[in-house]
Design a protein with these regions (language model features):
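Conserved acidic donor-binding segment of nucleotide-sugar-dependent glycosyltransferases
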Residues: 312-313, 317-324, 333-338
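Nucleotide-sugar-dependent
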Residues: 197, 256-263, 270-290, 300-308
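C-terminal amphipathic helix plus adjacent low-complexity
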Residues: 162-163, 350-403
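Membrane-proximal helix-turn-helix segments that form the acceptor-binding/catalytic region
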Residues: 111-131, 139, 155-161
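Nucleotide-activated donor-binding/catalytic signature segment of Leloir-type glycosyltransferases, i.e.
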Residues: 222-224, 231-264
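Conserved donor-binding/catalytic core segment of Leloir-type glycosyltransferases
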Residues: 5-8, 171-198, 202-210, 218-222, ...
């Protein structure tokens, strides 16, 4: 078996991982169960049961890559990894289209975010050996970029016309099925708020739901990594709820990963609202996987990747416009019609059986059993310089305050 180096950009030690952190925790578990020796690098050297752990640093990249057969990286940490690590067959996880998500921060942070995202993505596409994505839309998006960088080239195409040796689908997964508890509350969960969501619309939706179901509530959760995840929309939602004096809107801490099932089981239904954009076309809402795992029917704005799942498994309702009343009517219908509610929970259970992590990560498991360098990248790919992000004024101030 292989010695696998997982390079996770998010802290894991606090036990409250978000999407990227959750994915790395589950990747570690699956590869460990396959018999691999797994070492996880993260900003805080957070532990994953059965795996060794260390901090992200230039020194750890150099030292641990020498002793590894394969590496898995995601996001901006790839810049430092490719700059300081010994060459090792590397899987780049592209399930999170961060360059598109972060366009929402233009007004707040200007061009710097896009420039750094672009540099990161182009460098990773050129230097990675194998790539993972979460949907067919993502696969085509990244293949287009790979043509531009030379990674999709005639030599590779002649050998592998379907490009499966270059990029494969490995969507999010869920943990083992769990029994569903009887549910009689009217509490609605939104979860964490990112700046591409529309939490104010969700508040208005539940305000309308309360005209028919007076005890309905809405809960948002605070992100566990606010220092690296802008919280503009969360602040907007808090201000809006205070202005309206809505006591049915709650803002609670992010649930610990090991305890999230018990937390989700308090709710009857999940709600997601967001505007339609390229981000929704490419995204795979990872929380939807967790909500289905816990049997929550879902009412959501339209995002093609997850729309298809909810429709296929009859596990939720997709609203294709921005109308508050349409979202509210769907929620009232599900909560009042027990047959509909139960059918959606049954569909969610079928989804869980078919989306276990060991199944969704099959392409990664195959690569780790036989790691390899992709030699055509040396012949066709452009080679942009690797540049680590210079510290911003805010970074320097934070370090000075900690000193």
């Amino acid at each position: 078996m292989s010695r696998v180096l997982l390079v996770c950009p998010e802290p894991l030690g606090h036990g409250h991982p978000a999407g990227v952190g959750v994915r790395f925790v589950e990747i570690a578990r699956v590869l460990l169960n396959d018999g691999h020796d797994v070492l996880v690098l993260s900003p805080d050297a957070g532990k994953v049961d059965g795996c060794r752990a260390d901090h992200l640093s230039h020194e750890s990249f150099a030292a641990h890559s020498v002793a590894s057969d394969v590496a898995v990286v995601q996001g901006h940490v790839a810049n430092a990894f490719f700059l300081h690590a010994k060459p090792v067959p590397t899987v780049v996880d592209l399930y999170d289209p961060f360059i598109i998500e972060n366009m929402n921060y233009w007004a707040e942070r200007g061009a710097e975010v896009f420039q750094y995202d672009h540099l990161t993505l182009m460098g990773s596409l050129v230097r990675g050996d194998f790539f993972l994505c979460a949907s067919e839309a993502q696969r085509l998006f990244y293949l287009g970029l790979m043509v531009a960088t030379g990674r999709l080239n005639p030599m590779l195409f002649e050998r592998d016309p379907r490009l499966e040796s270059l990029i494969r689908l490995a969507p999010f997964g869920v943990q083992a099925p769990r029994p569903l508890k009887p549910q009689s509350s009217h509490d609605i969960l939104f979860g964490g708020v990112y700046d591409w969501y529309d939490p104010v619309r969700a508040i208005d939706v539940v305000a309308r739901v309360r005209e028919s179901i007076p005890d309905a509530t809405l809960t948002f959760t605070r992100h566990p990594n606010p220092d690296i995840t802008p919280q503009g929309k969360l602040a907007e939602a808090i201000g809006y709820a205070q202005k309206k004096r809505y006591d049915f809107v709650r803002f609670e801490p992010w649930a610990a990963y090991a305890e999230r099932a018990e937390y989700f089981e308090k709710f009857a239904l999940a709600l997601l609202t967001f505007p339609r954009s390229l981000e929704t076309d490419l995204s795979m809402r990872t929380r939807i996987y967790d909500y289905l795992w816990c049997g929550l029917p879902i009412v959501t704005s339209s995002a093609p990747g997850t729309d298809e799942l909810l429709v296929r498994y009859h596990a939720g309702t997709v609203i294709h416009d921005d109308a508050v009343e349409h979202h509210a009517d769907a929620i009232v219908s599900i909560l009042r019609e027990r047959a509909t509610f139960d059918a959606m929970r049954t569909g969610a259970q079928q989804f869980v059986r078919e989306h276990q992590w060991d199944r969704t990560l099959a392409p990664l498991r195959e690569f780790c059993r036989a790691p390899r360098f992709e030699k055509t990248k040396e012949l066709f790919a452009s080679q942009p310089a690797i540049t680590e992000r210079p510290p911003s004024i805010l970074d320097r101030l934070r370090r000075r305050l900690r000193a």
